[in-house]
Regions:
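Residues that act as N-cap/strand-start positions at coil-to-secondary-structure junctions
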Residues: 8-10, 57-59, 113, 146
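A short, highly charged, low-complexity intrinsically disordered segment
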Residues: 49-50, 158-163
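Conserved beta-sheet core of the metallophosphoesterase superfamily
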Residues: 68-153, 159
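Binuclear metal-dependent hydrolase catalytic cores centered on His/Asp/Glu-rich metal-binding motifs
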Residues: 1-6, 18-64, 71, 139-142
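Short loop/edge segments at beta-strand edges and connector loops
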Residues: 10-12, 65
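Generic detection of short hydrophobic beta-strand segments and adjacent strand-loop junctions
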Residues: 14-16, 152
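Acidic surface patches and DE-rich sequence motifs
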Residues: 17-18, 121
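Solvent-exposed coil/turn segments that connect beta secondary-structure elements
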Residues: 6, 13, 28-31, 133, ...
């Protein structure tokens, strides 16, 4: 990827400024379950340490996380102070049945529920953008599941004048 000019952010982040807006963009694989799961060997302590450092800024934080499971099922949006997480891995459920939805997703099993879309934290301040992506599993091809590339416009919050 680097030879094509991409900056791979694996347990790394960059602080950038675009049009006067200060952003922090980082990347992880995604085994970043909240602290309460660390004793269960389900979490990657290295990712948790990275996220503690990553979230320690006043900048708008954008995280690329290959795996969405910590964000969907384990209170990740509530636990971590990260404004927007972009994720995939679930392939939108690989096989979609009308009226039922996704049949199977990697690491989530049968009839997993939320497989793509935008999901918000309870207070509405943090967001997960989950893409069905372009990929297939090696065993089952996509069925009734159109590959997608997600495009998101990030715009600064407009502060209203106090009158």
């Amino acid at each position: 990827y680097e030879s094509a000019g991409a900056n791979v952010l694996d347990h790394q982040y960059e602080d950038i400024t675009i049009n006067g807006q200060h952003l922090r963009i980082g990347g992880i694989y995604g085994y970043c379950l909240p602290d309460k799961y660390l004793e269960t060997d389900e979490a990657d302590p290295g990712e948790c340490m990275f996220l503690r450092d990553f979230e320690n800024t006043d900048r708008y934080k954008i995280l690329l996380s290959h795996l969405p499971i910590a964000w969907l099922r384990n209170d990740g949006l509530e636990e971590w102070d990260i404004d927007c997480v972009f994720s995939g891995h679930l392939h939108g459920g690989q096989v979609i049945l009308p009226g039922i939805g996704g049949v199977y997703a990697p690491d989530m099993g049968w009839f997993p529920g939320r497989l793509e879309g935008v999901f918000d934290s309870e207070d509405g301040k943090r967001h997960l953008v989950l893409s069905a992506g372009l990929g297939n599993t090696e065993v089952v091809p996509r069925f009734n599941n159109i590959p997608e590339i997600v495009c998101v416009d990030l715009v600064p919050e407009v502060k209203k004048d106090a009158k």
